[in-house]
Regions:
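Right-handed parallel beta-helix
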Residues: 96-98, 162-173, 194-207, 216-230, ...
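Short, conserved, surface-exposed binding loops centered on an aromatic residue
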Residues: 378
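Extracellular "leader-to-stem" segments immediately downstream of a signal peptide or signal-anchor
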Residues: 1-178, 246, 255-265, 429-446
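Extracellular beta-strand/beta-solenoid scaffold signature
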Residues: 38, 69-90, 114-158, 178-190, ...
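Short His-Asn-centered micro-motif
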Residues: 56-57, 213, 281
Length: 446
């Protein structure tokens, strides 16, 4: 049946499973634990072959958890055994089920969080908020080669399985205190399978936002979040995850209008010292566009899976990062490389627009990218190319390349000096029509 919403939506809300219906019994009332009612509606939708579980506007509290089990191929020296590990979760979305509410876009309401709000009042200071165990797995993309990895057994608020969605709602942790921050489990956790979708969602003050565990085809779009520790984290996505039109910033908690919301200055002080906006480990052909991040210790982090060498390749378009300690931190990239275009990376005070770690040894291409702050390279064998880029607001040097190889083409430097520093272990610099009025100033110590 069609459900009438209070706030505008891009499509009709159609649902036969409304959580407040008598057969489920959810209540937007203080002190009422909605876990069982919501799970009953989710289970009913799944048993009917899938569908939308609808949540009318209101504040719904969650005060208890369920226990899940993960069977893991645990390492024992050079052999293995299987072992069960337990974790806690609040809601489990079965395949083919979408959880949908009535969502007000904060950008249209002066930042206010309105409509369907899920209040998480369980999980504070969980010892297993981001737990993992060393394990083995066979990589189907590499002739089933045996890999060492770490399997997440972390607690989570909503567990997402194949073909599930969380849309048109907000999630809030009322007991989080910016002056005494406590870890909470992941808000949204794609545990396995393909096609987990998060759309038109506001994460008001998650500790950790969305985790995509080994799977494929995650899709996060048209969403907002303040995450105090990690916003989005991707692990072993073996085909085409997508991030589109997502904004990660301290402002969404500060401007939420919800009780206890701290000042923007206080939230930024914490995230600038501790937080990472988007963290991509191995992902094969990740597509990221219109991602906006500000006020974090690290805006975008790209690198290896914990414990082994697999790293991502990706295309990033219209990614804009500002006011971060490192706008972009590149630990490593797989041999297919990373392409970044029509984007901008800005550093906060004493930060770097981009930093390449010593393990970087492949390729990153920047095309039409603005850098506000220094680009620093410590990668030994990699190639970094810049096409039609601009460099401004740097301190001593726009490019401080201590190692590696750099290609410059049609790049503009906004100062008449301090363009490039080449360290003693630098291999190659090639430049065409780049510099201040095409005059490139190089301080060569190689």
């Amino acid at each position: 049946q069609s459900v009438k919403t209070i706030y505008p939506t891009k499509d009709w809300a159609i649902s036969d499973f409304v959580v407040t219906a008598p057969e489920f019994g959810a209540k937007a009332e203080p002190g009422f634990d909605n876990r069982a009612a919501f799970q009953a509606a989710i289970d009913a939708a799944y048993q009917s072959g899938g569908g939308v579980v609808y949540i009318p506007a209101g504040n719904y509290e969650f005060r208890s958890t369920q226990v899940g089990t993960k069977n893991v191929r645990v390492r024992q020296g050079h052999s293995e055994t299987k072992k069960d590990f337990h974790f806690e979760y609040v809601l489990r979305l079965h395949p083919g089920v979408q959880l949908r509410g009535d969502w007000a876009d904060p950008a249209s309401h002066n930042g206010k969080v309105l409509g369907t709000i899920l209040e998480v009042r369980v999980g504070k200071d969980s010892p297993n908020y981001d737990g993992s165990v060393e394990s083995w797995w066979n990589d189907g993309q590499a002739d089933n080669a045996l890999r060492t990895t770490y399997t997440s057994i972390a607690d989570r608020f909503i567990e997402m399985n194949a073909g599930t969605g969380v849309t048109n709602l907000s999630i809030w942790y009322p007991e989080q205190d910016i002056h005494h921050v406590k870890p909470y489990p992941w808000t949204l956790f794609q545990t396995q399978g393909d096609c987990a979708t998060i759309e038109r969602v506001t994460l008001v003050n998650s500790y950790n936002g969305f985790n995509s565990a080994p799977s494929e085809l995650h899709y996060v779009l048209n969403s907002y979040m303040t995450a105090l520790n990690k916003g989005i984290e991707v692990h072993v996505c073996t085909d085409i995850g997508r991030i589109e039109n997502v904004r990660i910033s301290p402002e969404y908690w500060a401007n939420s209008g919800l009780p206890g919301a701290p000042s923007l200055e206080d939230v930024t002080a914490y995230t600038r010292a501790n937080g990472t906006g988007y963290q991509m480990h191995r992902s094969d052909w990740e597509y990221v566009s219109y991602l906006y991040i500000s006020g974090y210790k690290t805006g975008v982090w790209i690198g290896r899976e914990p414990g082994f060498a697999d790293a991502p390749n990706a295309q990033l378009y219209e990614v804009h990062v500002g006011g971060c300690g490192n706008g972009l931190y590149v630990e490593d990239v797989n041999p297919y490389g990373i392409l970044i275009s029509n984007s901008s990376f800005g550093a906060g005070q004493d930060g770097n627009a981009v930093y390449f770690y010593k393990d970087f040894s492949t390729s990153v291409q920047f095309n039409g990218v603005d850098f506000k702050g220094s680009v620093v390279g410590d990668g030994d064998g990699g190639v970094v190319s810049f096409e039609s880029c601009t460099f401004s607001e740097y301190n001593d040097y726009a490019l401080r390349m201590n190692r590696g190889n750099v290609l410059l083409s049609q790049c503009e430097f906004k100062k008449n000096a301090g363009h490039v520093y080449l360290g003693a272990n630098m291999h190659t610099l090639k430049s065409v029509n780049s510099g201040d009025k095409s005059k490139l100033k190089v301080d060569n110590h190689s």
